[in-house]
Amino acid sequence: MLHSMLSASRAPQRSAVRLCAVLAAAAVTPVAALAAALPAPPQTFDSSYVAPRGAILRVAAGQSLQAALNNARLGDTIVLQAGATFTGPFKLPNKPGTGWIYVVSSRLSYLPPPGTRVSPANAANMPKILAPNGLNALTTVANSHHFRFVGIELAPAPGTTLNYEVVAIGNFDTSPATLAHHIVFDRCYVHGNPNSNDRRGIEMDGAYVAVVDSYINGFQWADPVVDTQGLWAFNTTGPLQIRNNYIEAATENVMFGGADSRAAALVPTSIEIRNNHFFKPLSLISSTNYAVKNLLEFKAARRVWVAGNIFENNPLKSQTGFALLITPRNGGRAPWSVTSDIAIVGNTFINVGSGFNVAGFNDPGYPSTLMTQRILIRNNVVGVTGLNGADGREFQFINGGSDYIIDHNTINNTALSRISTVAVVESTRKISNFVFTNNLSTHSAYGFFGSGVGEGTRALNAYFTYWTFSRNVILGRPAASYPGGNFFPANVAAVRFVNYSGGNYALAAGSPYNNAGTDGMDIGANP
């Protein structure tokens, strides 16, 4: 399924193999071009809701949830009284047998059906599992497995002043053999409290862990050097699934890495991030208390699929305003850290300061990482606004790397910055096997720019080994500075969008860029 998605635009049946062939056949450049390799797909799994059929254990207000967790057998359902409060920490025991233990609301039938995202408006029909001060609501033991929480509110208890993680899956495991596994949060409301320091919603350091159809918000810490996340993982084999959620946090809405995995086999792997809404409140801009960085960050991750999401609002504040980062980091104990085989396909970015920051290695002078390889950024619609004074860089490529495909993206750049760019490249290492094709950019002050050498062909020759740069539409830049086979209209009107002022950036009938891509498709994103 992933490979067809990677190659899909209007024709989902086209294979990834054909995409590679098309990209390899793009216009010849002054440097002989090779086809960049596509990302390897993640291992995926089915997290669908299946109505349970086992014994029912009912837990009313004032009764023991931990006793129910201890006594339940795989296949049973624990029904918690809606509106009741259960204060943890609760441990999910390791049970023998097969099947799942469901933990559900007594008013589950009043909640949206499977496949539908919940919101805070549904909280009245949910029981509450709360975290006491400084502790978790739910934790795992070695090999906890097959728990599904459906229609539950999870949060710090009222009156708490700090919480590190509402839900902690994982125990700093040093081997895949002890990971918790098969744990799902389905239609849950996971949140921080307005007047406390709440660092994370769910740590997902297990295998076959999913968060689906849920609402996650309110994670912020009143210290500008403390990062917060809605969802986070750093130490797991995966697979992981994040599907159809609303996710909000002050620093990184979702992050992978940021702490050193305990073994090379525990770099987060096989991650599916699909159909979510990542959102930052604009009120964070005026606050001096919180670290505000990006919407999605990969510091250590392999085989990732990011598709069909909305990413909304990302300002310059604690960082430079990039919405999505692929930047490998090693804190000193994990030289195996890597960001590789990552596909960013068919997403919408709204009101972001800058777009994508991709690094090949950790920054010079810091502990080493493995090299970033096989990155695909395709069919995304990106609204770069320079929010809160960001530079308006659509792409940034630093510190080398290999096999990057940037293809069929539409970037509407309205940043007022005098240094806005289609891309900035800064590196002491060259990037090999680089494909930049069929992209459409509405504005930039410096075009595709290489630090210290200028734009266009000079930047490509200076910073890339084996590159293809073809059939891009870049408004207002000098054609003579670029390889042949690209387009440089003077203004937006010359592109002929369906409704530019109304935010519809598809090409209208009669646009000179209809069917003009290397693959015969419209230039720009083809949803």
Describe each PLM feature range:
Residues 38-55, 118-127, 429-437, 442-527:
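Acidic, glycine- and Ser/Thr-rich low-complexity intrinsically disordered tracts
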Residues 124-293:
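Right-handed parallel beta-helix
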Residues 110, 156, 161, 192, ...:
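Residues in short coils/turns that link rungs of repeat/solenoid architectures in beta-rich domains
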Residues 251-254, 258, 267-402:
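Beta-propeller domains
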Residues 73, 81, 95-98, 124, ...:
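Parallel beta-helix/beta-solenoid
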